[in-house]
Amino acid sequence: MRSILLTLTALLGGCASYQSLTLPETEALTRDVTQLKVEASAMPGAELAAHRFDPSDGFDMTELAMLAVVNSPDLRLARAEAGVTRAQAFSAGLLPDPQLALGRESVLGSPAGATVAFTAGLTVDIAALLARSATKGAADAEARKSNLDLLWQEWQTVAKARLLFVKLDAITQSQAVLGRQRASLRQRLDEAKRAVERGLVTNDASTPQLTAYEDANRQWNDQERQRNQAQHDLDALVGVAPEVSLPLVGSSDVTVMDATQVRAAIAESTRRRPDLLALQAGLEAQDDRYRGALRAQFPAITFGPTRARDTSNVNSAGFSLGISLPLFNRNRGNIAIEAATREKLRIDYQQRLDATSIESHRLLDEQAILQKQIAEIDASLPALEQVAEQASKAYAAHNVDSLTLTNIEGALLARRLERIAARQALQEQAIALQALLGTSVNLPERSTGASRTHLVEHTS
């Protein structure tokens, strides 16, 4: 008995102990991005992995995407969830603990030759041992699925960062065009007001400039509101405090995939896209659960040695065997559930494949429409710019009125803004297509230990 107590004490000494977890009382947004040390080799895309992260000179499109991957609050939560899945995989691989049963009986009274009786037995759940391979296989597949789901979320976060970069760049270009137009209109409006004050013209002469100026102001303010929204969306995406400045530098140009590249990427999507690979791993996990449910329909067995002594001091040894009788249940309910779940996952996978093909071709067609639109705008702009320049000279020579000049300049302004919007839309479609097809994603090795949690560390 003493040896048993010592064994139990030793086992308890190896147990995990409770540690309290304190909830934060303030926000934890990043206020100094220069303190972020990024592990570029762990980035989800080949372009990101080959890029040097240096926030000291501003953020180009790739650096902004890298910042989003390492510092996004949503991705932090996703990595924590992936940690739970890995812990579950670890738990599934542990062997079941044996069960120890002890009993003691004392004799009432004092009969001659009587002694204290005891029983001791050790049993092991054989069924759990037999089911371990299926359970462990399902857990490992779920861990791979979690890792691939996280990789897909990182890739989509990269796309979101790129989209915001493109949007902010387009807003900057639009405001530059509107700013020049506002300045020109403001100058002519002031000249018209001075002419009215001197009695050279009537108030009607300044109406076209005033109307055009107010319209340009309205468009400027609309762009300013869009900038504010996009900037706060970016702050939330990359997890920085609102007062942190994120100067954007460099080009917003995006490589546009052609039809041949898209078709090739669609054909490779089942081997390249992390979300499809995650669904494959999920189906593999469900297949193992289905196998486990089939095995569980057979009798559950427990077995182990026993040792006993009765009150007459007779010792005995033997074994115990427990078998469940599969007469009514036979695990048929769980078998049906796991089979139906497996079929649902197969249909989900097929639906994802179909949606990929449909959406890819839609984006490809939209790219072609936008490219044609931009080409038409580029073809018409030089002539329109020439007409506007001639009208400006004619207005200065008092050969055309302000209404004619304002209409021509308004048409030129609208065409320039249309080109900026069309270029933005083309870049957004190209980013969406790359995000959908996942052509340059760095895939992890097929391993449950391929964790994606260590992408960044804070340096002091």
PLM feature segments, named:
Residues 202, 356, 363, 398-402:
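Alpha-helical heptad-repeat coiled-coil segments that mediate oligomerization/polymerization in large
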Residues 132, 141, 148-268, 363-366, ...:
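Periplasmic alpha-helical coiled-coil/stalk elements that build and connect Gram-negative outer-membrane
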Residues 47-58, 101-128, 135, 245-259, ...:
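Small/polar, glycine/serine/threonine/aspartate-rich low-complexity segments that form flexible
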Residues 196-200, 395-399, 436:
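A short glycine-centered flexible hinge/capping loop motif at secondary-structure junctions
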